[in-house]
Amino acid sequence: MLFVTGLATLIALYASEYMSHDVGPGYCRFFAAFTLFVFSMSCLVMADNLVLLYLGWEGVGLCSYLLIGYFYKKPSAVAAAKKAFIVNRIGDLGLALGVWMAFVQFGTVEYAALFEKVGPFIEHAKAGRFDLIPWQVEAIALLLMVGAFGKSAQLPLYVWLPDAMEGPTPVSALIHAATMVTAGVYLVARMLPFFAVSEYALPIVAWVGCLTALLAATIGMAQFDIKRIMAYSTVSQLGYMFAGLGVLTAASSDPAAAAAGPYHVFTHAFFKALLFLSCGAVMHGFAGQLDLRKLSGVMFMPGWRIVGLGMLVGCLNLAGFPLITAGFFSKDMILAEAFVNPHMHAVGWLLLLTAGLTAYYTFRVFFRVFVGPQHFEPGDELHGHDDHSHDQHTTQHTAHSTHSDRAHDESASRGAHAHGHGDFHPHPPGWAINTVLAILSVGCFVAIVPYFVKWVPGIIEHSSAGLALVGGHGGEHTGAGHAHGTFLGFDPHAVMYYVSAVIGFVGIGVAFVLHYVGRTTAATSKADALLPVLGPIARWAQGKWFVDELYDAVIRVPLWVLAHVLHLIDKLLVDGLVNAAGAAPRAGGWGLRPTQQGQMHGYAAGMLAGVALLVLIGLMIVQ
């Protein structure tokens, strides 16, 4: 509740300036959906039963749909809203079935009663006797997991979140960085007893989180739209959180181990909101420009120092800069506990690789956009920001369309130069935006305090999660106790500080060399020299590994064809039979209509024909 309500207040203040262009019906519509979202999220967090949680869950889904599609006359925004809603339906179905099965199996949906009834199964799990646990309990955990993966954008249901950047930037900061997308992580943490007694749920959570983190990081490295880079970063960090829950709670009975995932939720809320709002300030001031190849040296332009410093603080936290950032400590906890679990070392190594990639793409944005030679080209929205004049703006604003070479050449021909673009002058953010960025920057450092005072472990120890900490779970479940893994022969808790620090420095250093050293223009960098070497890999990563295209080919197009075939069957066969039943008498009537002409000789001929027919039938019957 602390960061749901606190961050919502700050983002509302930010939005009061950011959305000031749209004072009128649009302004009211935005804040109506915004406040309804905060209510729904609060309902979700404060619920003491699964039904009330589900009510809040569906509420935030509805508000997300409304806010992503805020620019309802922009086709790409409408498509993104529908995509988010439909993909989340898959996860929500899993959650609904899980709630129903929990009620059928245990006769209640209240957390306290459910955890009391699942208590005996905890003992079976500790002993490694999963064969004594009913299959329905395993099914409940797996169904809840599907719901969590949908809402928190994990494989294979992550594709909706990057497209959700079509909504206004405050929406991205609140819903798709700080609160709603972490609802799935909250669900797993809240229902941890069910996951702890499941033989497969926690390992699946750990592996799906790990693979999602790595996949999203590779995509983020190759994007040029800074807002979408942060979106893929969010997907990646959510994967870290799930790995923290899947690996840490499975590896140790120590509440400090289980605290890593929830603590990363807490720290991530601050620095990712700061990053999104900093990107939004740039978008707001440069007419919607988000292409990192068309912006440079922003931090040193008049009026942009606070935005630049806020971005720097956010990047340091996301990259896990050692000792001074909350992001370092929360990420370090996850990495250490991944190696503590002797059965999850592969997950640990992949998370280490992801940490290095994260540091690289994070400072790729900072070095390209905020430092270096001063240069800017305004975006397509010279008359507004975030599609403020959406009544006229109907073109799709995606990374590929706005970053095309043709657009770059056309803008250059209109008078772009080293320090600007024609007569356009960027307008720095006002007091509301700067104040929010300053407060969030301070909050990123204050978020370190819970780590040292052991605040999160204390909460977990006295929560339902404390019941679910099963020693030795997540491996082979032998019931022989907890085996403590090592990192190259060393205690992970002792050395992971240094390992993660080195990984972070390497990522930042590579970004510094490739995107800052020797760069003379905004559009070029030393990284371009690697394209011939990385060729196909770079193209696939820039194409988001063509997952959307795969889903189109395997799921959307076949379903579209099937729907049209069924439509034709329904129209020609089903409707055809029904319509034929009415068409036959109508055709008979039209056929007999010429006999009704109002002439006596015609009627007489008809009567004679009828009498003759009756006589003929009578003779046939007699014979």
Predicted features by range, described:
Residues M1-V4, G128-A148, V347-A355, A480-V510:
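Hydrophobic alpha-helical transmembrane segments
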Residues L10-L53, L62-H425, V449:
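Hydrophobic transmembrane alpha-helices and their helix-loop junctions in integral membrane proteins
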Residues I11-A12, A217, V365, G507-V517, ...:
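Alpha-helical transmembrane segments
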Residues E58:
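Short phosphate-coordinating micro-motif centered on Lys-Gly-acidic
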Residues G91-F106, L312-A319, V436-I459, K544, ...:
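Hydrophobic alpha-helical membrane-insertion segments
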Residues V181, G209, L312-C315, I433-A447, ...:
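Hydrophobic membrane-spanning alpha-helices of multi-pass integral membrane proteins
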Residues K272-C279, G356-R368, I503-D528:
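Hydrophobic alpha-helical membrane-embedded segments
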Residues H427, V442, V453-S500, L514-Q623:
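Aromatic-capped, Gly/Pro-kinked transmembrane alpha-helices
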